Amino acid sequence: THKLQLEGLFGPAYYVTTSKELMESGTLANLSIKCLVLDYDKQERQMVSKMSYQEEIDWIVRNEKRNNFIKNLVSDLKGNTLVLFQFVEKHGKPLYDMLDKLDRKVFFVFGGTDAVDREKVREIVEREKDAIIVASFGTFSTGVNIKRLHNIVFSSPSKSKIRNLQSIGR
């Protein structure tokens, strides 16, 4: 629901505390955000600039060099890592197949994964030190609390501020 609609119904928002204050008090874990911007060659940039938004997203998630970069990034990260994706067949499954070849426990969670199995994955990862969860935004961006999660990799582009903030809150 839009912020202005909520304010119209309930009045202005009252902020009791901030994320910074919660981190300083130890209620929230400290976090560090590292934004990596990939540089594509001129020919690729020109080609993509002529695409519609949906075609561009499709090109991004199917880009083999980009997905290989994500695989290498995740393999270099220490600790439990959550890799979030948007499209199961064209992005999540290929990423899972690439990451599953690593010498680490790798789990694949999407809308078709039974709720009991999702909970088992969460419990297993909380006992692990170096596991990888490849999960769709829809299943792991909201409502899931993983206590021993060290890294989140947003492998799919998302313009949604709320989705991004909720995903970071895992």
Predicted segments, located by residue:
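Conserved interdomain hinge at the start of the Helicase C-terminal
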Residues: 45-86, 90-101
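Short glycine/proline-enriched coil/turn segments at helix->beta-strand junctions
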Residues: 11, 75-80, 100-105, 129-130, ...
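Conserved P-loop NTPase
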Residues: 29-49
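Conserved SF2 helicase motif VI
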Residues: 159-170
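Conserved helicase ATPase core of P-loop NTP-dependent helicases/translocases
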Residues: 82, 91-94, 104-141
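Post-DEXD/H (motif II) to motif III coupling segment of the RecA-like Helicase ATP-binding lobe
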Residues: 1-34
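Conserved catalytic network of the ASCE P-loop NTPase/AAA+ motor domain
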Residues: 27-29, 75-76, 123-129, 144-146
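Short, well-ordered beta-strand core segments
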Residues: 13, 81, 133, 152-153
